Amino acid sequence: ELSFLNNGVKIHLADLRKGKDEVFQFAGGVSGFVDFINRDKTKIHDNCFYTNKTVTVNPEENINVEVAMQWTDGYTENFLAYTNNIPQKDGGTHVNGLRSAMTAVIKRYIEESEFAKKEKIDLTGEDIREGLTCVLSLKMPEPKFSSQTKDKLVSSEARPAVEQVVRTALESYLQENPKDARIICEKIMDAARAREAARKARETTRRKGLLGSAGLPGKLADCSERDRSLCEVFLVEGDSAGGSAKQ
């Protein structure tokens, strides 16, 4: 982790008792970290998103934001966040800032592209982060954490700094890499469709369960209208007649 989070640093560990030594040095910073994490995964696009920028939050304080992201064909999110090389397994304000900026930029990009013309899908942050591998590294003076274990960052100035850097860089990335942007957006749209299909399947199962518990006939078709004052019951003879009645 340290060799990835501190680009250019070479770490040499030697055990003189056993004559063993290990050298850790990786190029690319957190971008190389993402590539290392995805080494056994199927990456759906070639160009890894990467940005490294320092933001001035007040005359005496600078925050360095380094982010790398790449989507795979998986269904789970792999998100690693660090502040001054300390990992935050519970996230914090820096993670909230990144997710907020990423969701806003990608949703706007899809709405303004040809995807929105084909179909209208309400995207969520979970849809956008499906299959995502992301490493966020923050360098800032005097960070504040929720506890002594430092598992969650609570410094309020971290969120706007990360949002600013990620929003600008991600907008440029999508415009400059249209092929990768299309692949990423198609992956996100597929995730949204799957979520919506699962929701409808759950609703159908619950409705059927309610009908079954009421002792109604198994061939009774569900109502397409939710307002019961507008619903009617049609009694027809035979399955073929039932199909015609539904139409």
What are the language-model segments listed below?
Residues 1-247:
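GHKL-family ATPase ATP-binding module
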